[in-house]
Amino acid sequence: MGIIDKIKAIEEEMARTQKNKATEHHLGLLKGKLARYRQQLLADEAGSGGGGGSGFEVAKSGDARVVLIGYPSVGKSSLLGKITTTKSEIAHYAFTTLTSVPGVLKYQGAEIQIVDLPGIIYGASQGKGRGRQVVATARTADLVLMVLDATKSEHQRASLEKELENVGIRLNKEKPNIYYKKKETGGVKVTFTSPPKTNLTEQAIKMILRDYRIHNAEVLVRDDQCTIDDFIDVINEQHRNYVKCLYVYNKIDAVSLEEVDKLAREPNTVVMSCEMDLGLQDVVEEIWYQLNLSRVYTKKRGVRPVFDDPLVVRNNSTIGDLCHGIHRDFKDKFKYALVWGSSAKHSPQKCGLNHRIDDEDVVSLFAK
Ligand SMILES: Nc1nc2c(ncn2[C@@H]2O[C@H](COP(=O)(O)OP(=O)(O)OP(=O)(O)O)[C@@H](O)[C@H]2O)c(=O)[nH]1
């Protein structure tokens, strides 16, 4: 039986099985198997561009990557046209095999790369065609922008979410708070910091590990809300990505005010109309907010800081990250930094590599 058939068989069995106390462990086991087969299906994705690595630590010029996901004709091209410069000047992305047209959104001195993944995400989890590349690309995103058509049913959103869920992309979710380590010997040791309030029992954990042929491991569940699904995610950690998602409803000009109001109240959601030029600024601001980037202005000795060309780094970055962003080897030459701004105790503060910088700090770096 091919993997696709195996997946189908498990999905069918899951659909047939009634959900109750007596079956929850069996369902958990099936979910574990399903996760494994889905992974196999996507196994050669690593070599197909995008890579799925950490993507962006401190990217070259502070770029972040946003991927647009949506069904055809929801208005992705229109949105790209409105908020980006049409073509990327930077060609350091590896999606040449995709027909996506990356654009650059210039905002607050940052260059944010926006990649349109044409409506081919659909079917990716079934291993269809270029879907895998799309998935690999989506994995490297700092933010997923799900573009939805306000005039269409909620089905679009649910189906895209499910598609991403199936390939291991978790939207707006924290990593489960479970410590897990494979061991050489000693059997499986499971500890809960407080009794689980969900279906995640010691028995379930052991059963799933056995199915994965893992016979020695230490598991510490630190959150009583963790479920079997969370545990499966933890043991498949290399294939999971926790990505923020912003839901953007386009074409609000074509629905009633009540409907717009209802959509706009959903979490992580912005409403807009490309055609009427409504809400586009909100989309840009929300992208910026969700990316949670910091701007750092560099300053040479005796000269005013350069305020029009900040280095953009992830929020909570250190001077070390900043150095790495400037050049791979810069850290080795680093002597000290002078920092002005809200992260500094006094202005300027002399700091080392581990100092955490705030948004809009001014930094002078001194080399040996
Ligand atoms: N009523 C309305 N129509 C819109 C709006 N934005 C886009 N459209 C229309 O929706 C259609 C699709 O827009 P595109 O921007 O091409 O959509 P897309 O998602 O890029 O489509 P694909 O290229 O097929 O993936 C076009 O006919 C647009 O005129 C809007 O805000 N309101």
UniProtKB/Swiss-Prot annotation:
PROSITE patterns linked: G_OBG (PS51710), GTP1_OBG (PS00905), TGS (PS51880)
GO biological process: cytoplasmic translation; positive regulation of cellular response to amino acid starvation
All copies of domain TGS, residue ranges: 292-367
GO molecular-function terms, A-Z: GTP binding; GTPase activity
Positions where Phosphoserine occurs in the chain: 364
Keywords, ordered alphabetically: Cytoplasm, GTP-binding, Nucleotide-binding, Phosphoprotein
Subcellular locations according to the entry: Cytoplasm
UniProt name for this protein: Ribosome-interacting GTPase 2
The organism of origin for this protein: Saccharomyces cerevisiae (strain ATCC 204508 / S288c)
